Amino acid sequence: MENKNHQQENFKSTYQSLVNSARILFVEKGYQAVSIDEISGKALVTKGAFYHHFKNKKQLLSACYKQQLIMIDAYITTKTDLTNGWSALESIFEHYLDYIIDNNKNLIPIQEVMPIIGWNELEKISLEYITGKVNAIVSKLIQENQLKAYDSDVLKNLLNGWFMHIAIHAKNLKELADKKGQFIAIYRGFLLSLKDK
C-alpha cells in the first residue's frame, strides 16, 4: 500500500512538474516555439514520462490553461463574498482585472490558447471556474426575480464577454492599468441596467 501511495505521489509530482515547466516556457517563448523535448528537459523528466501523462503538446496546453484559471479563481474566491449576487458580480470582475494586471507577465495569452485547443475546450475549462461562478450568480438572481426579463443565456454570454475582453487585451497592460477605473465604472453601469427595480 505504501508503494502504491509513493507511485501516486510520483505520478502527481511529475504531472505538476510538466505543467509548471510548460507554462513557464509557453509564457516566455510562445506555444509554437516550445518543443516537447524542451518541456521534458525543464521538468527534469524523460520524453517517455511526458507521453505517459499527455497525449501531445495540445493536451498539455489545456492543462496549463486550466492551472492558470485555477490560480485566478483561487485569487478571486479568497477576495469575494459569493453569497451576495450583485456585489459578487462586481467583485469578481474587479478582482479578475486586478489579477490580470498584476500577473500579466506570467499568463499564457488566450490568443495562443484558443486556436490550439479550440473554443469548445476553452469554454468547457472556463465553465469550471470564473464563467461557472458568473453563470451560477446570474441563475440565482433570475430565480430571485432581481434581473430584468432577459434570456438567461444572453445575459450569461454578455457578462462573461467582459472577462473575455480583458483576457484578450491582457497584453496591452498599460492600457488596462490606466483605464481600470473606466472599465469598472462601465461594467457597474451595465450591471445596474440589468436590475429589475
From Swiss-Prot:
<keyword id="KW-0804">Transcription</keyword>
<dbReference type="InterPro" id="IPR023772">
    <property type="entry name" value="DNA-bd_HTH_TetR-type_CS"/>
</dbReference>
<feature type="DNA-binding region" description="H-T-H motif">
    <location>
        <begin position="35"/>
        <end position="54"/>
    </location>
</feature>
<dbReference type="InterPro" id="IPR050624">
    <property type="entry name" value="HTH-type_Tx_Regulator"/>
</dbReference>
<dbReference type="GO" id="GO:0003677">
    <property type="term" value="F:DNA binding"/>
</dbReference>
<dbReference type="InterPro" id="IPR009057">
    <property type="entry name" value="Homeodomain-like_sf"/>
</dbReference>
<dbReference type="InterPro" id="IPR001647">
    <property type="entry name" value="HTH_TetR"/>
</dbReference>
<keyword id="KW-0805">Transcription regulation</keyword>
<feature type="domain" description="HTH tetR-type">
    <location>
        <begin position="12"/>
        <end position="72"/>
    </location>
</feature>
<dbReference type="Pfam" id="PF00440">
    <property type="entry name" value="TetR_N"/>
</dbReference>
<keyword id="KW-0238">DNA-binding</keyword>
<keyword id="KW-0814">Transposable element</keyword>
<protein>
    <recommendedName>
        <fullName>Transposon Tn10 TetC protein</fullName>
    </recommendedName>
</protein>
